[in-house]
């Protein structure tokens, strides 16, 4: 064979080798894409609190779509593994990835705070949720689920402390950087001698005797508890009894709905009230008020009108009208306080504004002015005296002042944080006075304050020139004003671990909760790379 023939043969063999290599590369790329897709679908299943088995349903839908849109590509869709077992493994891997990302951020935290709350799941197991909010040197805030701890045997303050200590240790969060703890105020968390907060405070002092942990009682929970001082039992009990009579029996309920349709009412039904949800109570009272004429007619049809004489008494109807108005005011406050990532000083400002409104209500009611009580205003001609309403508002005002005492201690610092350019620097702490003067005389910084978010504004301050202002802002911006994120996550837990899915393990529940609440995005490429041999589906 001549040299030229050898060269031709070598070129041909080389071309065949490249062709074979390309086949393997294409197969590998196809498998990698299929694995990536299965991770994305599993992530969305977890994010939306769907069952692991839904992966198989999603795949069947994908194949049906492929058959209609691109039948020649069906094989690629078949390669996407979405069996229940695969979805579970993918979710576990995503959880591990998000946990690792959080762990990488921890060293950058200047300070961190915790939000704690406990509740029971469908199996009657007490679950403790621990959320962490960390703030970095450049004021980047991270708010993530730290841990879900299952408390099978006991929920004492000492045991909960051990759970928190274990969670901090796993994430390598240093005690000396803990700024505050926010709870819903249950006894096991707030005990003065052996409660969790006492143990946490002692531990922080052991590590750094100059530091004092800030303890806050959830603003939203406090606001709800304030309603308990309103003497409304004589209003609520008959309303609940009426609603139960209408809705408890199917025949009564159907007949009432038919009556509403015949009368051409705007509402199609009355609402149930659950004792633990004050928001629902306000809506129930409003609905009963709007349908009081139809309810009276229905009770007469049933021969039950004598059992509910309140519906014909103007004094009781006036009390119902007042209850509706004050509950609507408070429900509006409650709604404004809700939301993830809200700063504590913003929530406190909202509460302070409501306290000022209460003062106005009290003063005006004492003068028989009911402008801000529109439902009560419809009963104006039948109201003999507004004294009892004035007393209720005064009691509510006092209860707000009492329950928000822990936030009141921070009021002066909150004022400086939120209004540094208008605060009186002479009344500020000595360490902040000179910095406030420099700040208030800087027109550039004033413009930044007016255009940027509060965290970005404080991040823009020179570290050496405004060291104390930055330190104060770091401490206050890292606070949890409420345990709303815990309450929201418990709702997600109840969706995931329901009667139909009660066999979910605690590990899987924690994975689902972390994924559904996290602001971080999974590193899909890294997750796929970690799977050396992507599996084909079945």
Q: Where is each model-derived feature located?
A:
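Alpha-helical structural modules in large enzymes and assemblies
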Residues: 1-538
